[in-house]
Curated annotation (Swiss-Prot):
Belongs to the ATPase epsilon chain family. This is ATP synthase subunit delta, mitochondrial. GO terms for biological process: proton motive force-driven ATP synthesis. HAMAP family: ATP_synth_epsil_bac. PANTHER family: ATP SYNTHASE DELTA/EPSILON CHAIN, ATP SYNTHASE SUBUNIT DELTA, MITOCHONDRIAL. Residues 1-27 form a transit peptide. It comes from Neurospora crassa (strain ATCC 24698 / 74-OR23-1A / CBS 708.71 / DSM 1257 / FGSC 987). Coiled coil: none annotated. One of its GO terms (cellular component) is proton-transporting ATP synthase complex. It comes from the Eukaryota.
Length: 165
C-alpha cells in the first residue's frame, strides 16, 4: 500500500514545474548524411564501420534501402543482392546467401551473413550448370536429405541467376 502512495505522489505535478519553459532543438544543426556500414562474413569483414551513402538489402519483408537516420530495425535477409553506394559515388554489389541486417540508432547498419561474394566473381554459365544439377536431384535423384539440400541450393542459385541477368 505504501508503494501506491508513492506512485500517486509522483503523479502530482507542482504548478511551478508546468510553467518551466521547454527547450527546443534547432533545425540549423547539420544532419549526418552517411551511414556506418559493417558487413561481416565468418571468414572476413568486407566493411568495418565504414561511411557509405546508402545500402540496398534483400529483406524477407521486401527490398529495402537504408539511408542515414533510418528507423532502427532488424531484418532477415533472403538470398540476393546487397548494393552499397559509397561516398565516392561508386557502387559495389555483393551476393549474400542470407543473413541478418540490424539498423541501429546513430546511422549504423550491421549486416551478418554466412556467405557473400562480390557479384563480379560469379560466372553466369557456371550458375546455369549448377542449377541444372540441383534440378536433377530435386526431381527425384537422391535421398530425402539430398533433395532438401538441393532445394535450398536451387533457391539460392535461382536468386543469383536473377541478379546476374
Amino acid at each position: 500500500m505504501n508503494s501506491l502512495r508513492i506512485a500517486r505522489a509522483a503523479l502530482r505535478v507542482r504548478p511551478t514545474a508546468v510553467r518551466a519553459p521547454l527547450q527546443r532543438r534547432g533545425y540549423a544543426e547539420a544532419v549526418a548524411d552517411k551511414i556506418k556500414l559493417s558487413l561481416s562474413l565468418p571468414h572476413q569483414a568486407i566493411y568495418k564501420s565504414q561511411d557509405v551513402v546508402q545500402v540496398n538489402i534483400p529483406a524477407v519483408s521486401g527490398e529495402m534501402g537504408v539511408l542515414a537516420n533510418h528507423v532502427p530495425s532488424i531484418e532477415q535477409l533472403k538470398p540476393g543482392l546487397v548494393e552499397v553506394i559509397e561516398e565516392s559515388g561508386s557502387n559495389k554489389q555483393y551476393f549474400l546467401s542470407g543473413g541478418f541486417a540490424v539498423v541501429q540508432p546513430g546511422s549504423k547498419l550491421s549486416i551478418n551473413a554466412v556467405e557473400g561474394y562480390a557479384l563480379e566473381d560469379f560466372s553466369a554459365e557456371a550458375v546455369r550448370a549448377q542449377i541444372a544439377e540441383a534440378q536433377k536431384i530435386v526431381s527425384g535423384g537422391g535421398s530425402q536429405q539430398d533433395i532438401a539440400e538441393a532445394q535450398v541450393e536451387l533457391e539460392v542459385l535461382e536468386s543469383l541467376q536473377a541478379v546476374l541477368k
